[in-house]
Amino acid sequence: MKRNILAVLIPALLAAGAANAAEIYNKDGNKLDLYGKVKAMRYLSDADSNASNNADKSYTRIGFKGQTLINDQLTGYGQWEYNFSLSNSESSSDAQSGNKTRLGFAGLKLKDYGSVDYGRNYGVIYDVEAFTDMMPEFGATGYTRTDTYMLTRGNSMLTWRNSDFFGLVDGLKIALQYQGKNEGSGTRATNVSNGDGYGASLSYKIVEGLTINGAMSSSNRLNANSASSTTSQKMAAYGSGGRAEAWATGLKYDANGVYLAGTYAETRNTNPFSGASYTFAGNSTATAVSGYANKVQNTELVAQYQFDSGLRPSLAYVQTKAKDIENGIGDADLSKFVDVAATYYFNKNMSAFVDYKVNLLSDSNKLHLNTDDIVAVGLVYQF
């Protein structure tokens, strides 16, 4: 009986991102839930040059969700979530590294008309990415990146969401989003800044277990005060242009213990290069390449099965390719890997996992990007 219950509960936990939250208060239409998790994790790799791929990656997250019933039609709500790194020293300069607010927003929900909230939240492009962000550790590591326009979590998100299309169409969900300007400054880097933008997503449950969705976004890019090619998004030496755009579509099947999903996305002038360099003709050493990809194509596939015993094996493929990079570089993979993983759920609160990222980038890849295979091993307690 316990195993059958696990088979039902675990997919729900994966979709919700947390186990059953602890109810702190529930009285007179006011409710407050506390949730969190501790992830004790280690990366293992034979990396010689990138120590971060062979290191402690443990962290804890804690958050709350609250709501208040204003009247029989209107409900107020809010959510906050914070991440604490567990791999830092207590007193050195790294003590606060990795500690950050992940989510923080408040809003109103008007029955069949949907909800409106504002704050630090997920961008609508992540509505699609969530279909394949299912691996124990290495999910959402292709083209999505925090504080990069509306790809995933970011600041100044004004979001309207509606389920079942005003109560008229079961399974049809829509979202409209506006992101306010977050300009680079002395403390905020250019590659995590954005101009104002808008986006939308649409999701439809075709039949029980089968869902299709799509999303798009378009944002203004910024000029830094110095308006130079190294600090301006619009004038970047690589990936210049006035707007950052993205679209994505996905399909998933989630029923009877089987989870299958695929997503495809394209971006324009959105994704910054990270750790890239290129050996130009006539040079014997590589030169750093800094800027943005003119175009990115991203493909992700995930297959998982939930056994009654609590075991959940996973197989995934991710490829992120930059197109038409300037100065003769052309097309180049930014990420390409197969992910082989397994999670064992002892119960709804405790699990263990191993996640093996098989890096498919060749040692001779154009942008000299990291080619290490990585194994993540960990224990997770969540509530």
Curated annotation (Swiss-Prot):
One of its GO terms (biological process) is monoatomic ion transmembrane transport. It is a multi-pass membrane protein. The keyword Transport applies. InterPro entries: Gram-neg_bact_OMP (IPR050298), Gram_neg_porin_domain (IPR033900), Porin_dom_sf (IPR023614), Porin_gammaproteobac (IPR001897), Porin_Gram-ve (IPR001702). It comes from the Bacteria. The keyword Signal applies. It is found in: Cell outer membrane. Gene3D superfamilies: Porin. Residues 46-58, 87-100, 123-155, 179-198, 220-243, 269-296, 320-335, 362-372 are extracellular. Residues 1-21 form the signal peptide. One of its GO terms (cellular component) is pore complex. The chain crosses the membrane at residues 31-45, 59-70, 75-86, 101-109, 113-122, 156-164, 172-178, 199-206, 210-219, 244-252, 259-268, 297-307, 311-319, 336-346, 352-361, 373-383. Keywords: Cell outer membrane, Ion transport, Membrane, Porin, Signal, Transmembrane, Transmembrane beta strand, Transport. One of its GO terms (molecular function) is porin activity. Residues 22-30, 71-74, 110-112, 165-171, 207-209, 253-258, 308-310, 347-351 are periplasmic. May play an important role in maintaining pathogenicity in plants. Homotrimer. Belongs to the Gram-negative porin family. This is Outer membrane protein Omp-EA.
